[in-house]
Amino acid sequence: MTGMTSNGRRPLLNRRLTEFGTTIFAEMSALALSTDSINLGQGFPDTDGPEEIREAAVRALRDGRGNQYPPGPGVPELRTAIAAHQKHHYGLSYDPDREVLVTAGATEAIAASLLALVEPGDEVIALEPYYDSYAAGIAMAGGTRVPVTLRPHEGRFRLDLDELRDAVTDNTRLLLLNTPHNPTGTVLSREELGEIAKLAVERDLLVVTDEVYEHLVFDDAEHVPLAGFPGMRERTVTIGSAGKTFSFTGWKVGWITSTPDLVTAVRSAKQFLTYVASGPFQYAVAEALALPDTYFEAFRADLRAKRDLLAAGLTAAGFEVFRPAGTYFVTTDIRPLGESDGFAFCRALPERAGVVAIPNAVFYDHREEGAPFVRFAFCKRTEVLEAAARRLRAAR
C-alpha cells in the first residue's frame, strides 16, 4: 500500500517532516569534535554576555522568582521592558499587557506564528537562503513554501522586488521576512522595506518579520522595523530575541510584538508548545533590555572588529567575501579556490584545515543557487578567529 513501510506499517515520521532529517549543524558540530577543529559553523558566542545580567538571573533563582510556572504571556517585568525597548529604539508603542508575548526563544515564536496564522494550502513567501526552521514551521502548519531568492549584486545579496511581487498569488497568506538576514548578512534598506510594506498592504498580506539580529548592524546600515511603515502595524508580527543581543543563547528567551488580535492568535498556538518557559531568565532579560545605549554600541563595535578580522583572513585564504552589513555571519564564495560544491567543501574542510563552516545550500530550496557559498560565524573570541584564519591560509 502506498505510504507503507516494508513491514506494512505507516512510516513513523509525519510526512510533513520527511524532508527534515539531522541538521547540518549537528553533522558539522560532530565533525568539529572528531577532528578537533575550530567550529565557525553554528551561530553561538563562545563567551557569556554581561556579568550583571548573569547575576540578575542568579538573584531571580535565589529569590524564587520564576522557579514555578510564570504567567503564560510572560512575566510583567519582561513584557514591560520589551515594550519600552521598542519605544526607545524605534518609536513603536505597544501595550505590554495585550501586545507583547514572551516565547521560548525566537524559534518557538516563528513556529507558533506559523501554526497560528497558516492553514493547509496557504502560501508563505520566504527569502532564500533562510534559517532552516522557517521551512519546518511552514511544513508543520501545512503551508506551501514559496522561496524568493536573494542573489549577489555589487558585493551584497540583493532582493529583487519584482520577483517578490511576482511570487504573490491569490493563495499567498503571509510573508516571512528576516532582516538583518541570516546567512547573507544583508540588511534590507528603508526603501526596500517601504516597497515590501506597500505590497503587503495592496495584497492584504500578513507579515512575520524575524528581527533577532536587530542590534547587530555595522557601518552605515540601519535596522528599520517593518511594523513602523504605514498600514503595517496591524498586519505584522515582529520577533525578537535575547540570545543574539545579549549572548545568552541557551536561555531561550524570545518574544513577539503585534496587535492584540495577532498576539492572541499566536498565543493560542504557543500555549500548546512550551506553555511557559525560562522563568528566572525572563527577569534577567528584563534588566538586560534596560541596559544603556553604550552597551549596544560597544557590542556592535566588538562584533564589527571581529567581522573585519575574519573577513580579512578569509580574503587572504582565497575566498571571495561578501562583507556583511549585519548579523554575525559572513558568506563566502569558494569558486576562487577552484571549488563549486559547498557540501563537499565543508565536509572536507575539518580534515584539510581544522576549521568547520556551513554550506549555504542547506538554506535554499533551489540548492543549485547556494552551491558555491559557505558561511562562517565570527561571534567567537579574537584569538579563535585569528587561529582559524591562520589554519585556512595554511591549507590554501
Predicted regions mapped to residue ranges:
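PLP-dependent enzyme catalytic core of the Aspartate aminotransferase-like
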Residues: 2, 166, 348-357, 362-396
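N-terminal small-domain helix-loop-helix segment of the aminotransferase-like
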Residues: 5-9, 14-105, 112, 160-163, ...
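Conserved core segment of the aminotransferase class I/II
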Residues: 7, 229, 233-304, 313, ...
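Helix C-cap/helix->beta junction micro-motif
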Residues: 35, 141, 202-203, 317, ...
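Conserved PLP-anchoring active-site segment centered on the Schiff-base-forming lysine
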Residues: 116-138
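Active-site phosphate-binding strand-loop segment of PLP-dependent enzymes
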Residues: 146, 150-219
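Conserved glycine-rich beta-strand-loop-beta hairpin in the small C-terminal domain of fold type I
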Residues: 286, 302-311, 321-334
